[in-house]
């Protein structure tokens, strides 16, 4: 039985999109190791542990939001295949919570993506703002790329080049 998607708490950004692909395909795209650089352009991901994306699994990464660059640790908080995935990124002065809720809808998938970006200290906040970084830009870019990849089956390298403005 599907787990209902909770309403996002105050301060958490949510964006919705419809993907013309079944939830299993969207889930597979979200966790495809070859697609990670394209799907998460703000992250330089370290190697995953064998259990990734299972809840409790961790991995390292380098996060770049706006002008801020920080080493972070990712932790998978919840992983329900073809249904839900939540993770948190924690680094020096920054915390980013991300969530994806996949719902079978009209032969495709309704994807609700959430993000909450929290910072400590004025410098961290200013570096993100000066570079025009935000949780909204992260989540909107991610959803656009996820939709393109899941629907069109484009190779990750092609989508990554387009996202970076090189193609």
Predicted features by range, described:
Residues 16-20, 62, 75, 88, ...:
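Generic structural detector for well-ordered beta-strands
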Residues 1-54, 164-167:
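Hydrophobic ligand-binding cavity/cleft-lining segments
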Residues 20-24, 51-53, 77-82, 101-110:
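A short, structured loop/turn motif at beta-sheet edges
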Residues 88-141, 146-148, 157-159:
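Beta-strand/loop substructures that line and gate deep hydrophobic ligand-binding cavities in soluble
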Residues 64-70, 119-123:
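Short, cysteine-centered beta-strand-loop-beta hairpins and adjacent loop/turn segments enriched
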Residues 48, 147-167:
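Short, highly charged C-terminal tails/helix-capping segments
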